[in-house]
């Protein structure tokens, strides 16, 4: 049984910053398995890289380890950052489903705000509109989508994504 925390850091040419990440939580009764999420808003490149610092305490003894981690660019855009009308920088991420079906899919979305370069708390109490579009078919949408909302403060947002046929869909989150 350990107490665990982590801090991802992007080392850029002129600055360093973190990204949205959850607490690390114990998920096994014997204390040998922990989980959490990290939402990387940008990929590494030839001169800029991510590392992950993990702090943990076992039987009152503190330990720290830091390792460079691989964060390659994604083929699909799943993260967006934007400046809100309130002057706050927001980050929105498509989390799930990883393999959507022609059906009404359970959907998970994350919404965070940039408090400062190292802190990105979850935004509470918003509604995320789910608007799937099929560009090759006249940009039509689909019925039965359910906007994503939080079940409890501090958590990710859950909704329903309806896909009516196979093919390329663009999922707009508003």
What are these regions (language model features)?
Residues 1, 101-118:
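Beta-strand-rich structural segments
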Residues 8, 38-40, 56, 111-113, ...:
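Hydrophobic beta-strand positions in extracellular immunoglobulin-like domains
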Residues 1-13:
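Acidic/polar, low-complexity intrinsically disordered N-terminal segments immediately downstream
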Residues 45-51, 102-104, 125, 154, ...:
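Extracellular Ig-like/FN3 beta-sandwich strand-entry sites
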Residues 54-61, 162-165, 171-174:
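Short, exposed beta-strand-loop hairpins at the edges of beta-sheets
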């Amino acid at each position: 049984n350990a107490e665990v925390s982590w801090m991802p850091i992007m080392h850029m040419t002129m600055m360093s910053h973190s990204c949205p990440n959850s607490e690390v939580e114990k998920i096994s009764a014997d204390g040998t398995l922990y989980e959490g999420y990290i939402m990387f808003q940008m990929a590494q490149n030839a001169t800029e890289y991510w590392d992950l610092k993990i702090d943990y305490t076992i039987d009152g003894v503190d330990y720290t380890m830091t390792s460079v981690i691989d964060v390659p660019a994604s083929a699909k855009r799943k993260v967006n950052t934007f400046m809100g009308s309130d002057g706050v920088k927001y980050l929105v991420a498509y989390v799930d489903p990883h393999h959507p079906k022609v059906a009404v899919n359970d959907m998970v979305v994350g919404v965070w705000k940039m408090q400062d370069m190292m802190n990105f708390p979850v935004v509470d109490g918003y509604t995320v509109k789910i608007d799937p579009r099929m560009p090759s078919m006249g940009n039509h949408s689909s019925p039965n989508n359910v906007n994503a909302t939080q079940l409890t403060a501090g958590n990710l947002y859950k909704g329903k994504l309806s896909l009516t046929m196979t093919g390329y869909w663009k999922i707009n989150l508003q």
